[in-house]
């Protein structure tokens, strides 16, 4: 894992854990970026697939969490790690 990704993943993990008051795990699988969030009994994954599409797995995912990832990080993730 390169240094830039380590710094990025720590930054997004810290931000998300603060904003959602939950546990956040981030990892890569091939060309997919996975963000798993466990929050007050809700567990879900946000996966950036095929470099452009985003899929959310889980039920009752709070809109503010999805917006946090989409609004703040989606463009950065795509530009920094997939271009």
Regions found by a protein language model. Name each.
Residues 1-3, 80-83:
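Short intrinsically disordered terminal tails
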Residues 1-28, 56-71, 75:
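Negatively charged, low-complexity tracts enriched in Asp/Glu with abundant Ser/Thr
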Residues 25-64:
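Acidic, low-complexity, intrinsically disordered interaction modules
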